[in-house]
Amino acid sequence: MPQVTKTNNENEFRLTRSKVQHQESISTIKNTTISNSQHKQQTQQQISSPPQVSVTSSEGVSHVNTRQYLGDVSNQYITNAKPTNKRKPLGGDNAPLQKQQHRPSRPIPIASDNNNNGSTSSSSNSSNNNNNDANRLASLAVPSRLPQKRQATESSTNLVEKLRVPQPEVGERSQSYHKKSRLIDYEWQDLDEEDSDDQLMVSEYVNEIFSYYYELETRMLPDPQYLFKQTLLKPRMRSILVDWLVEMHLKFKLLPESLFLAVNVMDRFMSVEVVQIDKLQLLATAALFTAAKYEEVFSPSVKNYAYFTDGSYTPEEVVQAEKYMLTILNFDLNYPNPMNFLRRISKADDYDVQSRTLGKYLLEITIVDYKFIGMRPSLCCASAMYLARLILGKLPVWNGNLIHYSGGYRISDMRECIELMFQYLIAPIEHDEFFKKYAMRKFMRASTLCRNWAKKFQASGRDLFDERLSTHRLTLEDDDEEEEIVVAEAEE
């Protein structure tokens, strides 16, 4: 009988586990299989004496790599880590950050239909005290980390009265509503009218959809100060972690929406939970695994994610971490993705490919750099589009259509975010994998182009927010003024 060969589908994407090889501990999977007891002994040996990391070049010569990888950061701080249990696969204490944010609210009395106006019968003091204690325990608020259970009501009329939300006064508008309540002092065109025949563009509902996004984005933001509240986590560790996450996202060829959602889920989780240093890689893997299932049509298997971690975690551990992470976040993944705002503002830019490609690179800066944590995605998209048009030399850089389709952002609103992006471009390269990704030809070598432009712009001493380059109209008021600006830029 002919022999049937079985194919191993563990590595469907033909991934290489890592460019970095540990000479002492990591061996080829095809030749050796390590038992659980031996794996624990080798892990303890790696903690006591971390192996040297070397990179083998194409010529066969090994060089010592000075780059600080994720495993090096874990080994450096692993002495402070505590053993984890099954209930907390990502480690950490008893959620001290969560106890600070989620305090039990005051008990809310539930109205009943029997209003006897003081005609109830008197009872003993002990029975009243017992009933009061029972009511207090029943009315305590459930922490938001757990799925909320539906409470029964005695009457449907009371439920309708409770669900009635009073309309806010004119002076009590929320912060997310301020862009819509401004006086429209700029010119803009209705570009959605062109898509009235296309049912996929839903032009009749697009304004309502993005109004909902603007209100939702403030609720889905992580705590901007969580890195400084964590006892072991440092900003440098998050930078290495997100850079590794970008590399895994590129290997799997996932959508940009999956990367943005994964970083948002990871930041929101660490805003309320303390994560051990040796579990950071597991958290990032579980976050991308969850985001891919939410955004992608065909998501990679969990075995591929576990394989990419270089055998550090098993598929069962990734699934267990995913369950725990979603429980803490109350299964809330309704995150207004920044790519939606970027596509919306690209309509006012005539869907220019160059502007949108540079905008995607500048937008991903906001997730790899910790300084942008807590900024609204719509603000980051508007700032990325402004800087992309400035790099390409488009005039006017910001006009009435861009103000309207960005959500009402003026240059004064974007000043802080644009300056942070510019400071990242002129600073030394910190995220290697992120820089290599956008140095490819299919991304128009955006990382190299933007950095070279930033250095020349800084040397020229020009102003990022030159009022002559922007207008509240559709075009610059005077054509001669536009020609003068172009000639001045050419001379510089």
Swiss-Prot record:
Comp. bias (Low complexity): 34-58, 111-135
Family annotation (InterPro entries): Cyclin, Cyclin-like_dom, Cyclin-like_sf, Cyclin_A/B-like, Cyclin_C-dom, Cyclin_N, Cyclins_cyclin-box
Gene knockout outcome: Impairs macrophage killing during infection.
GO molecular function annotations of the record: cyclin-dependent protein serine/threonine kinase activator activity; cyclin-dependent protein serine/threonine kinase regulator activity
One GO cellular component, as annotated: nucleus
Induction cue: Expressed from S phase through G2 and M phases and are degraded at the end of mitosis. Expression is down-regulated by the anti-fungal agent plagiochin E (PLE).
Entry-linked CDD domains: CYCLIN_CLBs_yeast_rpt2
Residue segments, region Disordered: 1-176
Pfam families per the UniProt record, alphabetical: Cyclin_C (PF02984), Cyclin_N (PF00134)
Regions crossing the membrane: none
GO process annotations (BP): cell division; filamentous growth; G1/S transition of mitotic cell cycle; meiotic nuclear division; negative regulation of ascospore formation; positive regulation of G2/M transition of mitotic cell cycle; positive regulation of mitotic sister chromatid biorientation; regulation of mitotic cell cycle
Keyword tags: Cell cycle, Cell division, Cyclin, Mitosis
Domain Cyclin N-terminal residues, every copy: 208-334
Residue ranges, compositional bias (Polar residues): 23-33, 59-83
Family to which the UniProt record says this protein belongs: Belongs to the cyclin family. Cyclin AB subfamily.
Free-text function comment from the UniProt entry: 2/mitotic-specific cyclin essential for the control of the cell cycle at the G2/M (mitosis) transition. G2/M cyclins accumulate steadily during G2 and are abruptly destroyed at mitosis. Degradation is necessary for the cell to exit from mitosis. Plays a role in morphogenesis by negatively regulating polarized growth. Through binding to CDC28 regulates cytokinesis, partly by phosphorylation of the actomyosin ring component IQG1. Also involved in the phosphorylation of CDC6 and CDC54.
Name of the protein this chain belongs to: G2/mitotic-specific cyclin CLB2
Source organism per UniProt: Candida albicans (strain SC5314 / ATCC MYA-2876) (Yeast)
Taxonomy of the source species: Eukaryota, Fungi, Dikarya, Ascomycota, Saccharomycotina
